[in-house]
């Protein structure tokens, strides 16, 4: 193996490890992480088999961020994929498995806004993929903006049963979430275009992010630079009301002049 090939393989390995590390950070510590069937290396060729597993013992009651993890996987992959999370009652614990592609004949939970509870008896399994989750959001009229309403699975393990509750939960601080999204978008735009970040932040749409505490509001400053042609005073209001009358009077004067000129021409003939 050449050095270039070795360095490239190590970079791919590190890329996959970063994804798994992010997933471990958002999963509750009560769910133990296990290795998947195959390691992940190349974002352009994600494996079809299980890439991570989380195991929860009896009497565990935790919330699993299924949508956030699936979107992490979809953003990491550089090809079209439909991430799938499988949830299985093994008889002694609950098992969460992650796939970049839904396996053949893998079950999908029939949940909706009104019906979101699933009970698994021993050895039964269910799951959800990103496309099905998007359909649920569209059908229920849920906010589809990033990080505004994310699906979590509340898992209650009471053997021999596992009770699952698929719920959408919003951020605790919506304004802080909007600020974080604006900063992430600014960093991405700076990385893609290479333009001046301060210049982009100055001219970005004002609705994307509220101003920081103590910092000047850029949108207000931009709007204050645009001054009206005439100040809205009592005199200008009277002038605006008089404009239609003046236009009518001027037109009538033109008509009278034309009639007089035509009469004079006919008279002198």
From Swiss-Prot:
InterPro entries: Herpesvirus_viron_egress-type (IPR007626). Its main location: host cell. It is found in: Host nucleus inner membrane. Keywords: Host membrane, Host nucleus, Late protein, Membrane, Phosphoprotein, Transmembrane, Transmembrane helix. The chain crosses the membrane at residues 248-268. Residues 1-247 are perinuclear space. Signal peptide: none annotated. Phosphorylated. GO terms for cellular component: host cell nuclear inner membrane; membrane. It is a single-pass membrane protein. Residues 269 are nuclear. Plays an essential role in virion nuclear egress, the first step of virion release from infected cell. Within the host nucleus, NEC1 interacts with the newly formed capsid through the vertexes and directs it to the inner nuclear membrane by associating with NEC2. Induces the budding of the capsid at the inner nuclear membrane as well as its envelopment into the perinuclear space. Belongs to the herpesviridae NEC2 protein family. HAMAP family: HSV_NEC2 (MF_04024). Forms a heterohexameric complex with NEC1. This is Nuclear egress protein 2. It comes from Varicella-zoster virus (strain Dumas) (HHV-3). The gene is NEC2.
